[in-house]
A protein has these predicted regions:
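Alpha/beta enzyme core
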Residues: 2-244, 250, 254-283, 287, ...
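Conserved small/polar residues in nucleotide/adenosyl-binding loops
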Residues: 300-306
Length: 306
């Protein structure tokens, strides 16, 4: 009897799945890497069918899906449910789970335990951590256990308050040097890729040139090795304010609103459902049904009079 596991071990790609070493090859060939967020099975499947290389189950779900004002309230349990759904839909892309605030800040041990949960309970291929500094030992610990890690520097939403709000980072020489140092440190700690968020394009391009691992930009210009956008932003689903780096490729909020409004109008005017939306019953069976129901109603009326 075969003992081969149905689910590949961490770092071992499933058949047909993009392998992490291929990302380095894409960087070497200057082939842009496409990453997009997803939060459920349908969005994961559509991202896969559209040709995305990486799918990030972002803690941005706290805002786009769960209705919070920031990413901070996202919990491990919520992120695991969302990631599990995405992995059911996305087969070829690498699925990366965003470690939410509080899941890795306390200690290396807790960070590793939560990363293991993502792999075991949701089927994630990798995890993403924000920041450098104390995050470096967390990265080393997780990578040491065989779980791939994506880094994230620049604007890190989980610590936006400490950074002075949702603002671009690295806009002075000193801060740009710090960003480069953080990115290099994350690479040395074992990250297979690094997100650069809200970083001036020339700074992001220089960081990309100096790193051997791929960079994924969001608001970091066209000189990074790849790009990422939030699902709800690029589809025009998110109704809040969007950063300047967002490009909307559709206005699905309007499309959906119009569709639901049309449905509501049809229901109220009794235009829906039509005959094509209903199920038939043979005439003889309908007659028997009515006869039976009528007899039962008659017997009930007699009992009530008694």
């Amino acid at each position: 009897m075969s003992t081969r596991p149905r689910t590949p071990a961490p770092g071992t790609p499933a058949p047909g799945k993009l392998a992490i070493p291929e990302l380095a090859g894409m960087k070497a060939r200057r082939q842009p890497i496409v990453m997009v967020t997803a939060y459920d099975a349908p969005s994961g499947r559509l991202a896969d069918e559209a040709g995305a290389d990486l799918v990030l189950v972002g803690d941005s779900a706290a805002m786009t899906v769960l209705g919070h004002d920031s990413t901070v309230p996202a919990t491990m349990d919520e992120m695991i449910v969302l990631t599990r759904a995405v992995t059911r839909g996305a087969r070829r892309p690498l699925v990366i789970a965003d470690m939410p605030f509080g899941s890795f800040q306390v200690s290396d041990t807790e960070a590793l335990e939560n990363a293991i949960r993502f792999v075991k309970e949701s089927g994630a291929d990798a995890v993403k951590l924000e920041g450098a500094g104390p995050t470096l030992t967390r990265v080393s610990s997780i990578v040491g256990a065989g779980i791939p890690v994506m880094g994230h520097v620049g604007l890190t939403p989980q610590s936006a308050t400490m950074l002075g709000g949702f603002k671009a980072q690295g806009r002075s020489a000193d801060k740009a040097v710090r960003l480069l140092a953080d990115a290099l440190a994350l690479e040395a700690a074992g990250c297979f890729s690094i997100v650069l968020e809200a970083v001036p394009a020339p700074v992001a391009e220089e960081i990309t040139r100096r790193l051997t691992v791929p960079t994924i930009g969001i608001g970091a210009g066209a000189g990074t090795d790849g790009q990422v956008l939030v699902w709800h932003d690029l589809l025009g689903l998110y109704q809040g304010s969007s950063p300047r780096f967002v490009k909307r490729y559709a206005d699905l909020a309007t499309t959906i609103r119009d569709a639901v409004s049309a449905y509501a109008a049809d229901v109220r005017e009794r235009r829906f459902p039509e005959d094509v939306h209903t199920y038939a019953i043979p005439e003889d069976e309908l007659a028997a049904f009515r006869e039976t129901v009528g007899a039962e109603i008659g017997r009930a009326s007699c009992r009530e009079r008694v």
